[in-house]
Amino acid sequence: MISAPDGRIIFEHEREDLAKMVKLIMERDDTNIAGGNFSFKVTDDDGKDYIIMTPTMMSQAYMGELSPEQILVVEPHTRRIVAGEGKLTREINLHEGVYDANPNIRAVLHSHAINNMFWATSGLPEPNVTEATQKLHEIETLEYEPNCSEPLAELVSEHITDIGDRALMHMYLLNSHGVLITVGKKDKVMDGLSAIHQALAIVDTSEWNAQIAYKQAVFQKLGLLDGFYSEGSKIGTLDDLKEGKAIFNPNAGIGKSDKSKKRSVIV
């Protein structure tokens, strides 16, 4: 049963929050006017899950200015819109595929982030060099499948299944398309709103990483660097990148001084 105070809309706080998030993502160039789509899971009073999701054309038609009433409440698999004004995006198949592949995932954020899309169109893995993004480990570009297609949804679902618990804090690059971020927790039902906020942090910090990794690649060609560097360590080279090797810092959070004996916490 979905309950709400008299005169109020169901899941009002969650839908209001997601509407604000859409505007912020647009303002920070974490997506373009083609938009992308964002969702997270909520549970009603009887323990039934629903998907809180942005409507189609949220950016092109409404330029990211959405009201809470325009955020959709969707019944999984039937795709019935329980509440909300607007139509369901065709990429609901992508979101459902992720949630089905790993039920611990509570949020999916798909956007067309400008700097990450540079790496996504290259077909190369994105070197992961900044401290804030090390929790993502490898940033892989998947094989190309057309947007909104069932083959794309199936491809992503297969990869989510293959990486297991790593999918609970992960980002894929969708070839020539954008990013796909998944967030959740193992052995604990993560609050969906917290999960989508974590996904927001990931898309924003990864944008900085994408730009910095690009500049480090340029510096290598100029002879100013001999590799990709992260937290004071060389973690890969242009040759590694060309070969499609994952470039990230396996020793992230460990300082270089004698005083640093413990792994620091990455937030």
Model-predicted segments: where are they?
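Glycine-rich flexible loops
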Residues: M1-V267
